[in-house]
């Protein structure tokens, strides 16, 4: 890509396909969501292909011994869940984590198959953000 992604998106110079985009609670210091909201809103105005937004906020087990130092859901912390590889990590995952992982694998698989992860698309009129957490 030869230009800034946000500039290309605003000008309609990105692929005209469905998008599923999201962030974790601590992506970019917790500031990642606003630019994603803008992208999804602009996308809904430019294309009939939807944009689906997610927000991963599961604080990973093993990082919560001292709540004052809890890093939150750091960048890439959702990857074990979305690829169904919790058993490859040292973390003390619970049954709820495995259920969350299963739901995320289902959503990504559904999106790859059909272009729809199983929740409403984000639009200016209906700003849906799917939250992934164990609670």
List where the protein language model places each region.
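C-terminal helix-and-tail extensions that cap enzymatic domains
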Residues: 4-135
């Amino acid at each position: 890509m030869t230009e800034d992604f946000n500039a290309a998106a605003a000008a309609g110079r990105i692929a005209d396909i469905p998008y599923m985009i999201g962030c974790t609670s601590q992506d970019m210091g917790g500031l990642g969501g606003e630019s994603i909201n803008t992208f999804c809103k602009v996308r809904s105005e430019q294309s009939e292909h939807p944009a689906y937004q997610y927000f991963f906020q599961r604080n990973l087990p093993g990082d919560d011994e001292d709540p004052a130092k809890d890093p939150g859901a750091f960048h890439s912390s959702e990857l074990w869940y979305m690829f169904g590889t919790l058993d490859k990590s040292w973390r003390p995952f619970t049954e709820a984590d495995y259920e969350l992982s299963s739901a995320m694998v289902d959503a990504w698989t559904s999106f790859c198959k059909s272009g729809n992860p199983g929740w409403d698309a984000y639009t200016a009129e209906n700003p849906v953000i799917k939250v992934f957490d164990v609670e």
